Amino acid sequence: MTVSRVCLLLLVALVYLDCCYAASIPRNFDPRLSEEIVMAPKKRPFCNAFTGCGRKRSQGPPGMPAQDLRTKQYLDEEALGSILDSESAIDELSRQILSEAKLWEAIQEASAEIARRKQKEAYIQ
C-alpha cells in the first residue's frame, strides 16, 4: 500500500512537472519586431539647410554610390594637398584671403556710412 501511494505520488508529480514545463505564459508578441530591429539602434535623419532632411548620415548623396563618393573625396584631398604643398600657392591663397578681408571691411564701412546718412536725414526732417 505504501509502495502504491509512493508510485501514485511520483506519477502525479511527473504529470504536474510535465504540465508546468509545457505551459507557456501568453504575451503580446508583435511579429514585426525581430531581434535585429530591437537590437539595432535607430538613426534619426540628418537635417541641414543645404540638403534638407530625409536621409541618414551614413547614406551618401542621392545618385552617388558610397564608393564613388569616397574616391572623389580622396582625389579632392589629394589635389588640395598638392596645391598647398607649393609655397607660391600658399602665398597666393594668403593674398586672396587678405583682399577678401579688406573688401569685407570696406563693405561694412560703406554700410555704416549709409546708415548714418539715413539716420541724419531722418533727424533733420
UniProtKB/Swiss-Prot annotation:
Organ and tissue specificity: Abdominal perivisceral organ; major neurohemal release site. Expressed in 116 neurons in post-embryonic central nervous system. Nine pairs of cells are observed in the brain, 4.5 pairs in the subesophageal ganglion, three pairs in each thoracic ganglion (T1-T3), three pairs in the first abdominal ganglion (A1), five pairs each in the second to sixth abdominal ganglia (A2-A6) and 7.5 pairs in the terminal ganglion. Expressed in every ganglion in each post-embryonic stage, except in the thoracic ganglia of first- and second-instar larvae.
Swiss-Prot/TrEMBL GO biological process terms: neuropeptide signaling pathway; positive regulation of heart contraction
UniProt keyword annotations, A-Z: Amidation, Cleavage on pair of basic residues, Disulfide bond, Hormone, Neuropeptide, Secreted, Signal
Record flagged with keyword Cytoplasm: no
One example GO MF annotation: neuropeptide hormone activity
Signal peptide: 1-22
GO-annotated cellular components: extracellular region
Record-listed Cysteine amide modification sites: 53
Disulfide bonds: 47-53
Superkingdom per UniProt: Eukaryota
Location relative to the cell: Secreted
Propeptide feature: residues: 23-42, 57-125
Physiological role: Cardioregulatory neurohormone that increases heart beat rate during adult wing inflation; has no effect on beat amplitude. The effect of CCAP is both ino- and chronotropic.
Stated name of the protein: Cardioactive peptide
